[in-house]
Amino acid sequence: MRIAQPVRRNHRAGISLIELVVVLGIIAALAAAAIPSIQDMLERRRLQGFARDLGNMFQIARSQAIRTGNNQIAYFGPLGNTDGPAGNVLVDSAGETVPMLILDDGPPATANCHIDFGESRETIPLPNEIGFGVSEATVKVPTDTGSAAFSPPQTSGTTASDPSNNPTNWVLFRPDGIPVGFDPTSTTCGTIGDTGTGGAGLYVTSGGRDYAVTLAPLGSVRVHTWSEAGWTQ
């Protein structure tokens, strides 16, 4: 007499179509929920990186002034800005407009505070979806000593000024590394300010987040971010 063997079920059978649809739906929902946070992270990193680049450019200008004994001028602001009365647009070596340019203007005795052909320059590009000004901040950084008025959205992106407190988009670093404001003519540096006139703030935004870079009157640089509690120090 034969004993009936138990039926063996195949536990390796594939999942059903309904189960597959459910799994894919869960994956899609998780991915959709993660996209905004990823985009926010990328936006923050891009803006933070640009703010740090601006701060680094100030530090480069200061160190170059001390090293070479030449005037170094930092020009900055929205694309299309110029070097003042001379009207030279801020561009890189390829002719592309840039948000910041460091110019080696030569020894103080011969410097003219304008961008001339052949002068050494350093530039940085403007990242996509980043601009000058603020979108959330309501006040300037407390340690921003720039004399130009601050009024959101501050489309100039700066509080830099000349010795008479008129808004500008430049700062001159003397050979001792001290930043000062100046009021150029069409051919010369015009009036160069004393120590204390070069403090300024730069403000950049992604449309939903704001960062600032402050240049102290003696040349130190700090990067700040805006939050509900105000600017970080």
Residue ranges and their predicted role:
Residues 2-7, 29, 33-47, 52-59, ...:
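N-terminal helix-rich module
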Residues 5-28, 33:
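Glycine-centered recognition micro-motifs in short, flexible terminal segments and loops
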